[in-house]
Amino acid sequence: MESSRWDKDPPGERRPQQSQHWRARDHGARGCGPRQPTATASPRPGLWITPAHGSHTPQTNTRRTQADNIFIYESWLIHHGTQMSSVLPQPPLVRGPWHNTNSPWDSWASRGKLRVCPCRTPRLHSSGCFSSKAGTALSPSLPVPGLRPQPPFLQKPLSILAPATPPALVSPTPPKLSPGQLSPHSVNVHWGPQGHLHLPRSGTTVLHAYLQTLSSPASHQ
């Protein structure tokens, strides 16, 4: 009876430790020797049933899990450099790295390559709001290749960028600084590419003194 590829051991060969195990039948051409049965798709998708032994080998206690099937499938891909599309109808279910796609570019084709998340574009100043060196930071007026042009409402003179106070409280005259101090316009204050205000690293006290003079009660008269 040729309906099933898998059947129980014939009762003549049954041994007590092997009684419940399924054995693979060889339906080869007549006159061929025993051959290794090919992979069979189980009714549960994502599982591939392959005999874990050659047809000469008696079957020992073997369980094959989903991880084993993925490993077998991926080792085939590494060895042959192609998808087993003619042998396996679909690859076993493997999650893509970010989205739930099962495209062949997700898990195995990009194993060694650096994967960039498709949701993010690489940006300048990715380290946060502070540039690494305050002097080399980009001012919005300079055209930088690869950087989006700034919207016009961000291109303002630096004197109105620095104070965080509402405009009614800012005095129209610039604050008087002692001659030892720099003018507030020489401070490296600039807008980052996402519209964050970049301040110089801590240790610079000029901007702090400038903001203090702005918020002092003398400047509100």
UniProtKB/Swiss-Prot annotation:
Q: What are the Basic and acidic residues biased-composition ranges? A: 1-16
Superkingdom of this protein's organism = Eukaryota
The UniProt annotation puts the region (Disordered) at 1-64
The entry's protein name is: Putative uncharacterized protein DIP2C-AS1
